[in-house]
Amino acid sequence: RVLRALQFAARFALTMDEPSKALCRTIALDDLPAERIWGEFEKLLFAAQPSIGLALGLELGVIEALFPELFALVGCPQEPEWHPEGDVWVHTLQVVDQARRRLTGLPRPKQIAIMMGAVAHDLGKPATTAFIDGRIRSIDHEEQGVTPASRFLDRLNLNSIDGYDVRAQVLGITAQHLKPGMWFKAKDKEGVGDGAFRRLAQKVDLELLALVASADCHGRVPGVFDCTAMDWFRERAHALGVQHHPPSPILLGRHLIALGVKPGPTMGELLKAVYEQQLDGTVADLDGALAAARHLIASAQA
């Protein structure tokens, strides 16, 4: 009932009186199955303003009791120049609200991946935040966030939904959420090749990543920060046709069999090597893939 109160508060913008809050704080939550917790948490996430329910959950002790990975965000400082809104918890609530506005037209499993990615994206900050050279830094927090994000998903028993691997996408979003902004900054310096986009698409849905990165950028003081990087990132991904998945391999085992290659480790190595060339863009069609394979075979036999 306490969890239901949170999602009702979020869905209907309700407030709770003090006696009700006091009563909720006395109710034990340690015997709830993961499926029940997820059922209420999912409804909370799809409220118009999920932050209302999350903030109430913190006030009632629910976040501390059920989600220690989220509770660790409370009071975790951020560099004021980049995060004038406050600590990581405050920022996360704003990002979740922004993410909720970016779900239109997507199937439910992808919507869940976006919302959970927004919740989990900065879970690596508590373990990495330090004061360095006069600045609050959270170096490598995106990669370090994968482990606490995994624990968080375990608490909800959240894996695949309707055949879609939500868990993999949430972890991918967490690990890669800085890429759109970083690559945008690098594009006029060392540049970011098409191969980088194709390879990143092996790790995460680039469309979902861009949407969460946009929510992350806007989940601060409104109107202060330039968030056009995410539009650029989405346009590049769409132009390459890798917004949802990496390119399908052009060269297949049957093509190598026709060249006289027997099934086995050598075939696997050839397929992998030619696919890497495809990702780089040096192989663009079957003729090119076959030529690359013949060259590799000849080199190995020389």
Residues covered by each model-derived region:
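Histidine/acidic-rich helix-loop-helix segments that form or flank divalent-metal centers
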Residues: 76-84, 158-227, 242
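Glycine- and charge-enriched loop/helix tracts that form the active or gating conduit
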Residues: 1-115, 119, 123-140, 144-162, ...
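Terminal helices and disordered tails flanking the catalytic cores of nucleotide-processing hydrolases
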Residues: 184-190, 217-302
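Active-site lining segments that contact anionic ligands and/or coordinate catalytic metals
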Residues: 111-115, 120, 169-171, 205-212, ...
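Short hydrophobic/aromatic segments of transmembrane alpha-helices and their interfaces
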Residues: 107-108, 202-203, 239
